[in-house]
Amino acid sequence: MSHTAEIPLVPGSESPLELKPLKAADPQIVYHRRAHRLLSLAKDSPLADYFELCRRLVSIQAKLAEGADFGQLLAWGKDEATPLSLLGSEADSYWQGLLQQLLSDLLPQVDESIARVVRLLMQQSPEQLSSWGRSLRQGHVSEVPAHFSLFIWAAMGVYWSHWAPMVIKRMDQRKVAQQSMCPVCGCHPVASVIVDQPRAGLRYLHCSLCESEWHYIRAHCTSCGQDKEMTIWSLDDAQAQVRIESCDECHGYTKMMFVENSPSMDVAADDLATLMLDSELNAKGFGATTLNPLLMAHETT
């Protein structure tokens, strides 16, 4: 059972047209939608086997999000800019418990090559898992064995996405400034989403860990913030549902998902399905400033 009664609620506006600086996600809905989208995208993908692995993993996340024991909300930085980034080592036992459940459920669903990785990860010490989890949350992906990152992040995502909505209710959103990293947990975004509510054309960045979304003005670089030298790219036409916004100053880029036109889209699944866009931008000297929880590519800097 979750306990949050000791944290006072912060009053806010009830206007349906007010721009919300920060939006909470329902992890069960997110994971179910993501699993369905992965199944749909796999049909025409050369990465169909990997999409299926991710679908099974995300389906287990949905199951855990619904019925796992998350204990009580631990001490968090309620006066800090990114409150859930400051969870102490006490959180490790909870997400590591989720990791063991996730791996146990996944083990009979995968082939032997992946099963060996799963069994090896299940044998790691709590201290080692804590260290790897901390490195991933800090963006130091290359410090963690690549074959473990996907599963560790998935377990942490279930834990952090469970608590994020409750913490958001208790944050003073008037103090949430435009920023590159998640204002709730401090992690990288997956991509931008362009929505039609409460007003058409608003952009939000979607967190790779806690699944929260925060407003970010369009035509501004989501990494360095400049707004003078920005370029939009797409594979087919200017109205593509997935486009890339690149910065000529810092040479970073982020994808934009126009979910207002295609509600079935999911940031992680559709990012994975459009890796050809990444290849094109990488060849031009640009680098992603985002992180996909289904890919966990090692940083290049």
Curated annotation (Swiss-Prot):
PANTHER family with a match to the protein in the record: PROTEIN FDHE
Please tell me whether the keyword Cytoplasm is annotated for this protein: yes
Q: Please give the Gene Ontology molecular function terms for this protein.
A: ferric iron binding
Instruction: Reply yes or no: does the keyword Phosphoprotein apply.
Output: no
Biological process (GO) annotations held by this record are: protein maturation
Keywords from UniProt, A to Z, are:
Cytoplasm
Describe the task this protein carries out. Necessary for formate dehydrogenase activity.
User: Which pairs of positions does the record mark as disulfide bonds?
Assistant: none
Under Pfam families, the record lists: FdhE_C, FdhE_central, FdhE_N
Q: Which family does it belong to?
A: Belongs to the FdhE family.
Question: What is the name attached to this protein's record?
Answer: Protein FdhE homolog
What compartments host this protein? Cytoplasm
Q: What is its main location?
A: cytoplasm
Please give the organism.
Shewanella baltica (strain OS195)
Q: Which GO terms describe its cellular component?
A: cytosol
